Each structure stands twice: as C-alpha cells, then as structure tokens.
C-alpha cells in the first residue's frame, strides 16, 4: 500500500470513533445546569470524552480489520493499555493522547488481518485463530512502549511546539487550517488533519486537575480559549455553501432549473442543518475546480475572521444548525457566538455573488450548465433492492477494470475508495453512467468514485461480489455513448400516417424538453410529449401488443400494428417506489385496443412520494419513420384526445 493509500484508509478508519462524539456532546450539554441540570447525564457524556483515546483504539482497530471484527477491537484495547501503562514507567511525562489509540488500533487491526487464521500446535490450539490476535497485539505494543518511552518525548515536544505556534499565530493559524482542510476534502485526508487539530493540539487543565488536549475536548471541558479550529466553519456550512447552491440554481438555464433545483435544495438543507457539506461540494468540485479553490480560500478567511473577532464556538459532529443550537450558551466555552449569524449572512451574500459572477465569467459547467454532448445517459436501476445493489456493484467492478485490476475496496460517506493495479484501466464514462458524479485518480493505484450517500452499501456489495468470483473488465465496446441530442425528425410532406395515438393519460400536456429527466428531455429515449396526470387510469394509446411491463408497473412498452414502439413512462424515478402506487390491469403479451386500461395509479401516494409525476409518452424507434406531428395541447382526456401522429 502506498503512503497516500495508507492515509486515505486511515481517514476512513477514524470515522467510526469520531461518530460517537455527537452522543457524548448531547449528554454533556443536556446535563449542564442551564438545561436539565442532571449531573449523571453530564458525567455520562464526559466519560466518553475522558476515554476518547481508548475509543479510538477500539474503533480504529475494528475499522482497519478486514471484516470489522470484534477480536480486532479487543486487540486494540489490549494494545492501548499495554502501550500507555508500560510507556510511562520509562518517562512519566509522556502523554500521547488519541495518537496512542490510533497507533494501537492500527497494530490491532493489522495483527488481525495477518494472524486471525493462524494455526498453532495442538497443545496450543486454544490460543490459535482470532484468540491469538490480542496476544500478538499486546506483545507488539510492549515492544512499542519500550521504543516510544525514549523516542516519543521529542516527538511530543515537536507536536506541542507546532500546536503552540499555530495557536500563537491566532487568526492566521486558524485561517491556514481552514484553507488546507477544504483542499484535502477531494483526497479524504482532511480526517487525519482534523484529528490532530480537534483532539491533539492545545492543552487545558480543569479545576479537578484533568488535562484535555485538542480543540473539541478543550471546548467541552469548558476552555474559553478553545474553538479556533471550529468557529469559522459555521458561517460557511450554514450559510456560505447554501448561497453557492442558490447561485448555481440561477446560473442554470431556466428550462433546466426544475431538473437541478430539487437536488440543490436537498444538499443545501443538509449542509445548513447538519454541516455535512460533501454532497454539495462534490457538485462543483470536479465540474468547476476554480470554484472549489475559491471555496477553500473563503473557508480560510471565515476561520481567520472568526478568530480575529474573538468568537469561540464548537461542535460535536459538524458546523450545522443543530450543533450551533446545542452549544450556543455552553457555560465557560461559548463566546460571541451570535456574531456567527452576522458572519453567515455576509458569507451567504459573498458566496452567491462570487459564484454567480465566476460561473458566468468563465462559463463553468456547474449542474444544469453541462454541454449536451457531455451529458451522460444514466440507466434506471433500483439499488434499493439486494438484487439491484448487487448488479450495480458488479457493474462498478467491471467499470474499474474488473477483479484483476481491483485490489482493495473501501468506502466513506460519499466515496468508494479503491486501490487498483492501474488507474488507466478505469472506465470513467461507465462509472458516471452508473450514477457516479466524479472519478478522482489520485495516482496510478489510488482512485475515488463519488457515488453519494449509498457509498458504503455499494462498497459492501462490491466486496461480496468479489468474494463470489472474478468479474471481467468492461470492454471498450461496452463504453456507454454520451447522450447526444436526438434531432427531432420532421414529417415528410404527404407522408403516410402509420399510427394516430390517443392520450393514454388524463391530464395536462407538458413539452418533452420540460421533463425533469435529461434522457427524456434530450429525446435520447425517443420523441413525443409528456403529460402531468390528473386521473388514476392509464390506457393504451393505440391498438397493438404490450411487449413489456416493468416489474414495478411504472412503465410499459406498446408495439403498434405498424411497428411503432411506444413507451409510456409514469413519472420520473418512480422505479424507486418498487411498484407502490401502481397496479397492472393487463399482462405482458396482451393484445390491446386503443383506450383499453393498462395501469391503475394511486395518485395521492405518487404525488406525495414520486420525484415528479410528469409522464413521457415517446416513440422509441422514431428514427425508423419520417417523424411525428404533435396534436395535443392543454388539458387532455385519456382514450379520447389525439396525442400525436407518426408518419412513415
């Protein structure tokens, strides 16, 4: 494993112990005198912070092991006790903090991966296999204790001096941290930097004589000087990035805003409430790197200004509105936090103006502004089912070069972190067709595939697929073609009509280019028109044969007597509803007449749960004919109103 790959994997392993912090902070906060004033609740939260290094040892060991094993977690705990207790007998001043937990966790996880299947002689067989792992870890950590007892004091001094320099640098130090923090997001290494800043740098001793290290620990212990590595994130995550999302919405052409609006709104609300910004950042990180660089600079400026103004705020998870409300009046620690709201309004305006100007000035390809020839056709796949997820995982394995090229699989919140033999063999286009928003090739062996919130599920499914046997790489011929716009065929004068369709749906006509799905809107699926339904019955638009009804009953394909293939697709992304809201009234292979009922819908349910109920009705093989003539407009009635005419 190369150095970059190691630190990427370490960043993933750190997420498990960090995930317990919100619970600890909630308990500690609600137990305070100004809220519930219940000491045992506060102590419960404090206990987690007091034993954070041990929690890191357990969490890192489990995450580093090949199958998240409990034996590895136990080994991490054993190693931690051996290392910390043995080391101080050599030098009582040694205090490794969470770094001791991280190191022993790595030793425990590595020992498990190496020796969990070890076979010992019969008289020692009880101690073989997984039972051997804590024993081996304890031995190795004893050796480390003997080494670190002499080696660590100068390292500890260097870390302390570096931390003191950053703290003494004040606003400049926090600004540099904020800038580098955002720059490391694409590589995933920000978790390593955060761990040092939030759990190691700085020292605070409370009235009881307990020593706390790191910005988060010191903040929740009541250190009024803590927060320089946290405060400035609140204006960015709660206000700045939502301002960027609004700018990207208005920068998109008007006809495409409905397609990107829902997505931008959801990621902006997520950033505001929880401080989880990666889904929003990844929308422009790869499409417009210049914007991401400006975002990193603005983040650094925000941390710089917050420190300069004497603002001291903290969080347990991230800088969202939920954490802001919890820490707003935390005794002794929170100071001037109201100013973050003022900063937030200012940064909202800055992000909106800067993003708006830069996007238009440099014609950046933010969501909704992509060139038609760059848009990728995405297949409709239901990854909510086990079968669908397995197929998606198999496709991703093929896209990255097959099992021969794939060496290691890991995942975090939004990314598949993959180690490959040769990143040049990765099919970026196929990855994007499968739903990835970007592929990052960090070096020849390390890549990241940005797949969104289902990254961990997809990663787990990929591991299961690999365990079952080899998967071939996707062939060059299998590379999906980009969705070049399909020119609308023009009906030849005096051409013969081969099909006159009636509307299959009662509702209001919507032009095809207004459908909130690029595959339909670009006419890549076929030409036709769409309808926003107002009645529950879907009928056949012409006489012919039902050649296909999707198993989720949300769409069907009709072949007319003259060979026109008509696709009636009820709603957008309704496949994700797994058939709920739809009932088929005929079966595949049925001979039907125009106006015969095919599907019945629960419109109340569908309108509440579907992304959109705008329903395309297209001729998928329109290239076989001279064109079509749209006849419908306004409000139309199923089985009665002429929809369009196909000409030979």
Curated annotation (Swiss-Prot):
Its main location: membrane. Disruption phenotype: Cells lacking nagE and nagA reduce by 50% the amount of GlcNAc6P. Together with the mutations of the genes of the peptidoglycan recycling pathway (ampG, anmK, murQ, nagK and nagZ), the accumulation of GlcNAc6P is eliminated. The active site is at 412 (phosphocysteine intermediate), 569 (tele-phosphohistidine intermediate). Residues 390-472 form the PTS EIIB type-1 domain. GO terms for cellular component: organelle inner membrane; plasma membrane. The keyword Metal-binding applies. The modification Phosphocysteine is found at residue 412. One of its GO terms (biological process) is DNA damage response. Keywords: Cell inner membrane, Cell membrane, Formylation, Kinase, Membrane, Metal-binding, Phosphoprotein, Phosphotransferase system, Sugar transport, Transferase, Transmembrane, Transmembrane helix, Transport, Zinc. 60% of isolated protein was N-formylated. Its cofactor is Zn(2+). It catalyses: N(pros)-phospho-L-histidyl-[protein] + N-acetyl-D-glucosamine(out) = N-acetyl-D-glucosamine 6-phosphate(in) + L-histidyl-[protein]. P-chloromercuribenzoate inhibits the accumulation of both N-acetyl-D-glucosamine and antibiotic streptozotocin (2-deoxy-2-(3-methyl-3-nitrosoureido)-D-glucopyranose). N-acetyl-D-glucosamine is a competitive inhibitor for the uptake of streptozotocin. InterPro entries: Dup_hybrid_motif, Glu_permease_IIB, PTrfase_EIIB_Cys, PTS_EIIA_1_perm, PTS_EIIC, PTS_EIIC_1, PTS_Glucose_EIICBA, PTS_IIB_1. Residues 517-621 form the PTS EIIA type-1 domain. GO terms for molecular function: kinase activity; metal ion binding; N-acetylglucosamine transmembrane transporter activity; protein-N(pi)-phosphohistidine--N-acetyl-D-glucosamine phosphotransferase activity; protein-N(PI)-phosphohistidine-sugar phosphotransferase activity; protein-phosphocysteine-glucosamine phosphotransferase system transporter activity; protein-phosphocysteine-N-acetylglucosamine phosphotransferase system transporter activity; protein-phosphocysteine-sugar phosphotransferase activity. Zn(2+) binds at residues 554, 569. The chain crosses the membrane at residues 16-36, 38-58, 70-90, 92-112, 132-152, 159-179, 192-212, 232-252, 260-280, 282-302, 303-323, 339-359. It holds the Pfam family PTS_EIIA_1. It is a multi-pass membrane protein. Residues 1-371 form the PTS EIIC type-1 domain. It is found in: Cell inner membrane. The modification Phosphohistidine is found at residue 569. This is PTS system N-acetylglucosamine-specific EIICBA component.
């Amino acid at each position: 494993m190369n150095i970059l790959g190691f630190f990427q994997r370490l960043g993933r392993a750190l997420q498990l112990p960090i995930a317990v912090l919100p619970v600890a902070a909630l308990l500690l906060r609600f137990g305070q005198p100004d809220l519930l004033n219940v000491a045992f609740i506060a102590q419960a939260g404090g206990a987690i912070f007091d034993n954070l290094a041990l929690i890191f040892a357990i969490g890192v060991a489990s995450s580093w092991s090949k199958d998240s094993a409990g034996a590895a977690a136990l080994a991490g705990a054993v190693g931690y006790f051996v290392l910390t207790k043995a080391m101080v007998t050599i030098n009582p001043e040694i205090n490794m903090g969470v770094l001791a937990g991280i190191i022993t966790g790595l030793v425990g996880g590595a020992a498990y991966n190496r020796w969990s299947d070890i076979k010992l002689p019969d008289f020692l067989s009880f101690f073989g296999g997984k039972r051997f792992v804590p024993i081996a870890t304890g031995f190795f950590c004893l050796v480390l204790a003997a080494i670190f007892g002499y080696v660590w004091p100068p390292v500890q001094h260097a870390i302390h001096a570096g931390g003191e320099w950053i703290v003494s640098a004040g606003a400049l130090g926090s600004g540099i941290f904020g800038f580098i923090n955002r720059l490391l997001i694409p590589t995933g290494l920000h978790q390593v930097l955060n761990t040092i800043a939030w759990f190691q740098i700085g020292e605070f001793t409370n009235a009881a004589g307990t020593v706390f290290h790191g910005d988060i620990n010191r903040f929740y212990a009541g250190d009024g000087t803590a927060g320089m590595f946290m405060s400035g994130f609140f204006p960015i995550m709660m206000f700045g990035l939502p301002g960027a999302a609004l700018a990207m919405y208005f920068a998109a052409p008007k006809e495409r805003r409905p397609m990107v609006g829902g997505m931008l709104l959801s990621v902006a609300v997520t950033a505001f409430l929880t401080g989880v910004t990666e889904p929003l950042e990844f929308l422009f990180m790869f499409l417009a790197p210049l914007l991401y660089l400006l975002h990193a600079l603005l983040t650094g400026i925000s941390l710089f200004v917050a420190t300069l103004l004497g603002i001291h705020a903290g969080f347990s998870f991230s800088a969202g509105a939920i954490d802001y409300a919890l820490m707003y009046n935390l005794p002794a620690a929170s100071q001037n936090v109201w100013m973050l709201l003022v900063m937030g309004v200012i940064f909202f305006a800055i992000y909106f103006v800067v993003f708006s100007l830069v996007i238009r000035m440099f014609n950046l390809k933010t969501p909704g502004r992509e060139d038609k020839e760059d848009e990728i056709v995405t297949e409709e796949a239901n990854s909510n089912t086990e079968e669908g997820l397995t197929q998606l995982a198999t496709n991703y394995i093929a896209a990255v070069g097959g099992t021969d090229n794939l060496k290691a699989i890991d995942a975090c919140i939004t990314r598949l972190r993959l180690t490959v033999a040769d990143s040049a063999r990765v099919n970026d286009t196929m990855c994007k067709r499968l739903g990835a928003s970007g592929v990052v090739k960090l070096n020849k062996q390390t890549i990241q595939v940005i797949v969104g919130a289902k990254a961990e599920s997809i990663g787990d499914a990929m591991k299961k697929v690999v365990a079952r046997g080899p998967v071939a790489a996707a062939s060059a011929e299998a590379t999906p073609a980009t969705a070049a716009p399909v020119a609308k065929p023009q009906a030849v004068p005096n051409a013969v009509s081969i099909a006159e369709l009636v509307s299959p749906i009662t509702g209001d006509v919507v032009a095809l280019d207004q459908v909130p799905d690029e595959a339909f809107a670009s006419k890549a699926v076929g030409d036709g028109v769409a309808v926003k339904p107002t009645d529950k019955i879907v009928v056949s638009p012409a006489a012919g044969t039902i050649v296909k009804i999707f198993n989720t009953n949300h769409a069907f394909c009709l072949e007319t007597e003259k060979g026109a293939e008509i696709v009636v697709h009820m709603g957008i992304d309704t496949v994700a509803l797994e058939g709920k809201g739809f009932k088929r009234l005929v079966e595949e292979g049925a001979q039907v007449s125009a106006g015969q009922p095919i599907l019945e819908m629960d419109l109340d349910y569908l309108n509440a749960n579907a992304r959109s109920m705008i329903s395309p009705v297209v001729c998928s093989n329109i290239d076989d004919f001279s064109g079509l003539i749209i006849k419908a407009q306004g409000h139309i009635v199923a089985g009665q109103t002429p929809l369009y005419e196909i000409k030979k």
